[in-house]
Curated annotation (Swiss-Prot):
Optimum pH is 4.5. Gene3D superfamilies: 3.60.21.10, Purple acid phosphatase-like, N-terminal (2.60.40.380). The gene is PAP1. Its cofactor is Fe cation; Mn(2+); Zn(2+); Cu(2+). Residues 1-38 form the signal peptide. SUPFAM superfamilies: Metallo-dependent phosphatases, Purple acid phosphatase, N-terminal domain. One of its GO terms (molecular function) is metal ion binding. It is an enzyme of class 3 (hydrolase). One of its GO terms (cellular component) is extracellular region. Its EC number is 3.1.3.2. Glycans are attached at N118, N180, N311, N433. The keyword Cytoplasm does not apply. Homodimer; disulfide-linked. This is Purple acid phosphatase 1.
Amino acid sequence: MRLVVVGLWCLILGLILNPTKFCDAGVTSSYVRKSLSALPNAEDVDMPWDSDVFAVPSGYNAPQQVHITQGDYEGRGVIISWTTPYDKAGANKVVYWSENSKSQKRAMGTVVTYKYYNYTSAFIHHCTIKDLEYDTKYYYRLGFGDAKRQFWFVTPPKPGPDVPYVFGLIGDIGQTHDSNTTLTHYEQNSAKGQAVLFMGDLSYSNRWPNHDNNRWDTWGRFSERSVAYQPWIWTAGNHEIDYAPDIGEYQPFVPFTNRYPTPHEASGSGDPLWYAIKRASAHIIVLSSYSGFVKYSPQYKWFTSELEKVNRSETPWLIVLVHAPLYNSYEAHYMEGEAMRAIFEPYFVYYKVDIVFSGHVHSYERSERVSNVAYNIVNAKCTPVSDESAPVYITIGDGGNSEGLASEMTQPQPSYSAFREASFGHGIFDIKNRTHAHFSWHRNQDGASVEADSLWLLNRYWASEDASSMSAM
C-alpha cells in the first residue's frame, strides 16, 4: 500500500510541475523546422575535416577517440576504449582511482587493428575494468609523458527497485552541424542524463566514397566529449553493417565491432550485436535488427532465455533497444520492422516490457500502448489494438545525420501513433522509482530543457501488482 501512495504522489507532483496528458492519441505536430536544405552527398553535409570538434589531441602518440560503455552485467564494470597512432610501451595501460581514494590502480588492455578496403586503422585499445564500487566517481588516465589525458566516470547505483536513474536517448546522429547541435543540446539539458542509450547509426562513414573509414576516426573524436565521461549503451544500426562486395568487403560490421565492444558475454550472448545489462533499476535488452532473429536462431534463443532471467523486484523497468522501429507511421522505412515485430511482440506483451526505443527513421514518434498479437493469417485481425500489457514504442532516430529528416508521413495518422514530428533532437528517460518514470523529447530548436513531447509512464509489472493488491484489500 505504501508503494501505491508513493507512486500516486510522484504522479500528482509530476502533473503539477509538467501538465502533460497520458498518451494523447493522434497528434502530428504543426511545428515546421526551418530546413538547412539537406544535400544528397555526405561530403556536402558532414562537418569539414578541419572542424574543431575533430581536432587531434596534442602530444606524441596521444590517446584519442576515447569512449566507455558498461563492462559487465550488473554495472560494476566499464570498458574503456581509445586509439593511438603507434603501439608503443605504455600506450595500452589505464591508470584509475576513485575520488575517495589516493590509491591508483593499473590495468592493461588488448589492442587490435583492422583493414577495410584501402584503410588501415590506428591501434585500437580496449580495457575492461571490473569490481568497481557502485555509485562512485572514478578518474582514469591514458597515455604517458606530455600526451597524458585524464577523464572520469560515475558508476551506477547498485540495482534495486526504487533506485532513480536518468538515461539520455540519442539515435542516428552522424557528424553534421545538426549532429553537433544535438549533442550540445543533450549536454546542456538540466535533466543531466547519467548514461546514454544509443539507438544505432554512429558515423555514417558508409555514405562516403568507399565507406571512408577516416570518418569513423572523426566521429570518435567528435563524440569523445560525452562518451569518454558517461557510458553509451550501443545498438547496431544499418549504417554499421558496412557490407560492400563492390569493394571486396564481405564481412559485415567490421569497423563497428572492432571499435565499439559490448559486454555481450556477461549476459550469455555469443554475439556483440545483442546483449543485456542491468543498470540501477533498469534491465536493458539490446537487439539486432540486422542479424538472424527468427525462431531457433541464436538471437531468438538468447532473447527468450534472457527474458526468463529478468527480476522485476530488483530491476522493475524492462527496456528494449532495437534499431528498426516495430511501429512506424512515416513513409521512410515503413513496415521494415514488421517481420521482427511478428516474432518478438508476443514476448514484449507477455513479459510486460515497459518501453521500446528505436532509431532508423530520422524523425520522432511515440506510440500508444498497443499490440497486434491477435493477428494470424487465418483470422486477419491485422489492426493494432489497445493493450495495457504492451510497451510504448518510441522512435528517436533524429540525431542529425547527413541523410536529413524523414518528413513524409502516412496519412491519415494511425490510431496507434500518439505523437510525431519531423525534427532533430534527443530524449530523456527519467526513472523515479519502481512505479513511475518520465519520458521527454527535446527538439534542437528549443531551449535544452523545453519538452516538445512528454509522458509519465506507469511501470507495467508493478501497475498490475498494485492493482492486484488493491483488489484483494
